[in-house]
From Swiss-Prot:
Record note on quaternary structure: The complex is composed of two ATP-binding proteins (AraG), two transmembrane proteins (AraH) and a solute-binding protein (AraF).
Disulfide bonds, paired cysteine numbers: none
EC number from the UniProt entry: 7.5.2.12
GO CC field: plasma membrane
Record has Cell inner membrane as a keyword: yes
UniProt-recorded name of the protein: Arabinose import ATP-binding protein AraG
NCBIfam families membership: PRK11288.1
Gene from which the chain derives: araG
Protein's job: Part of the ABC transporter complex AraFGH involved in arabinose import. Responsible for energy coupling to the transport system.
Limits of the ABC transporter domain: 8-243, 256-499
SMART domains given in the database record: AAA
Length: 504
């Protein structure tokens, strides 16, 4: 039952940056003992609101009210001391320090300037036990798995008696087992009467955890759902994108041309058995498989990121020798990698540079001078055509949302003479509206005759977008399914390891 008095309230919150209005008049309430989800497309304002709550940003207008008192935090330390903790996607811990030191960093127990190690490890052990974690507090953090790092971050919040704990995309790097453990902890924190804010694009997580959902769009409050029995996927999507998008995938049958890409008994590092497949001009082929199936390893090998150890790659019936990415690009084969931030973009460069970096060599003046006129026009053209949301072409790409970063990478390859595009988890961590836009780009590329090979662990996405689905299992092809005939049961049956099938 919802309490009558909210523990946390946002009142008319607005935030303006130079040239950008990030938040406008955000007002809603959160209650103790509830998980309150925040949803919206990338750039909707969720992370900005959390940064205001945590003291990273000061609001331009409005106020934050905690337990009836209007609060203003000068920095994150002030917020943490007031009982507000944010568990970010990129964890703020020190790998070289011990678990206990990370938990009590800034408030280490000491006497006469000397840290009381015995008391430190004892207190840290109590916090870890509270979370059900069997970890030696004296262990250096660097030796723990990422899921355990997250538990240390939560223990750090509890050590400061945090009453408000916000999670920002917490499961993006976790295994299924680690996600289950995180959910167990969040439910325990809810039982203890804490306010839990939860930001995620994964609707299955939202429905599994939430007592209330607030939706943002374009920096504005849209709606708060409080009756979880009456809200469904379609209602959330409509609130997030401002329209009923119906079938988000929008697949339609199309005709294909001649064979454009062929793999003849190709092996790459991490791919156990030779892979043979073909993709025709204008065809979209989806690669599906469970973790460890070899999808990403095959993609990296085809692009020259890792070594092809056997077999032959053909483009337009011509054998291609790919030993590094420049060989693939020269042959007309491009890659949007799974690790978008680490391998797909240059974070400290502008959107303009990230779009132009590959094709600029073809447009230099006198063989050595950058053609600024071409670069400006090319970047602006792709920003407009791909609907990249940015204050301008000179904005650092690291400041863009994941969906807009992905569209900038696509813009880079649209600047080249593309025959084949390899897409590895192209919509991971991207909101539903941006996914729809990226699917439309994929369809447009296919309509232009590009052969599309994309790998995804999102089975509904593969079934919804691909003309043909190639299922991989333990580094080999387990089977193929046509779009019109494929369903989740068939695909999962093919993808499951043989041992599991035998046990079943």
């Amino acid at each position: 039952m919802q309490q009558s008095t909210p523990y946390l309230s946002f009142r008319g919150i607005g935030k303006t940056f130079p040239g950008v209005k990030a938040l406008t008049d955000i007002s809603f309430d959160c209650y103790a003992g509830q998980v309150h989800a925040l949803m919206g497309e990338n750039g909707a304002g969720k992370s900005t609101l959390l940064k205001i709550l945590s003291g990273n940003y000061a609001p331009t207008t409005g106020s934050v009210v905690i337990n009836g008192q209007e609060m203003s935090f000068s920095d994150t330390t002030a917020a943490l001391n007031a009982g507000v903790a944010i568990i970010y996607q990129e964890l703020h811990l020190v790998p070289e320090m011990t678990v206990a030191e990370n938990i009590y960093l800034g408030q280490l127990p000491h006497k006469g300037g000397i840290v009381n190690r015995s008391l430190l490890n004892y207190e840290a052990g109590l916090q870890l036990k509270h979370l059900g974690m069997d970890i030696d507090p004296d262990t250096p953090l660097k030796y723990l798995a990422i899921g355990q790092w997250q538990m240390v971050e939560i223990a750090k919040a509890l050590a400061r008696n945090a009453k408000i704990i916000a999670f920002d995309e917490p499961t993006s790097s976790l295994s299924a087992r680690e996600i289950g453990n995180l959910f167990r902890v969040i439910r325990e924190l809810r039982k203890e009467g804490r306010v839990i804010l939860y930001v995620s694009h994964r609707m299955e997580e939202i429905f599994a955890l939430s007592d209330a959902i607030t939706v943002f769009k374009d920096g504005r409050y849209v709606k708060t759902f409080t009756d979880m029995q009456q809200v469904d996927h379609d209602a959330l999507v409509q609130a997030m994108v401002g329209r009923d998008i119906g079938d988000i995938y929008g697949w339609q049958p199309r005709s294909y041309g001649e064979e454009r890409l062929r793999l003849d008994a190709v092996k790459a590092l991490g791919v156990r058995t030779p892979i043979s497949l073909a993709v025709r001009s204008g065809e979209i082929v989806g690669l599906f498989g469970l973790v460890g199936a070899g999808r990403s390893e095959l993609m990296k090998g085809l692009f020259g990121g890792t070594q092809i150890t056997a077999g032959q790659v053909y483009i337009d019936q011509q054998p291609i020798d790919i030993r590094k990415p420049s060989h693939a690009i020269a042959a007309g084969m491009m890659l949007c990698p799974e690790a978008r931030k680490a391998e797909g973009i240059i974070p400290v460069h502008s959107v303009r540079d990230n779009i132009n970096i590959s094709a600029r060599r073809k447009h230099v003046l006198g063989g050595c001078v950058i053609n600024n006129s071409w670069e400006e026009n090319n970047a602006d053209q792709h920003i407009r055509s791909l609907n990249i949301k940015t204050p301008g072409a000179e904005q650092l790409i690291m400041n863009l949302s994941g969906g807009n970063q992905q569209k900038a990478i696509l813009g880079r390859w649209l600047s080249e003479e593309m025959k084949v595009i390899l897409l590895d988890e192209p919509t991971r961590g991207i909101d539903v509206g941006a996914k729809h836009e990226i699917y439309n780009v994929i369809y447009a590329l296919a309509a232009q005759g590009v052969a599309v090979l994309f790998a995804s662990s999102d089975l509904p996405e593969v079934l919804g977008v691909a003309d043909r689905i190639v299922v991989m299992r333990e580094g080999e092809i387990a089977g193929e399914l046509l779009h019109e005939q494929a369903d989740e049961r068939q695909a999962l049956s093919l993808a499951m390891p043989k041992v599991s099938q035998a046990v079943a």
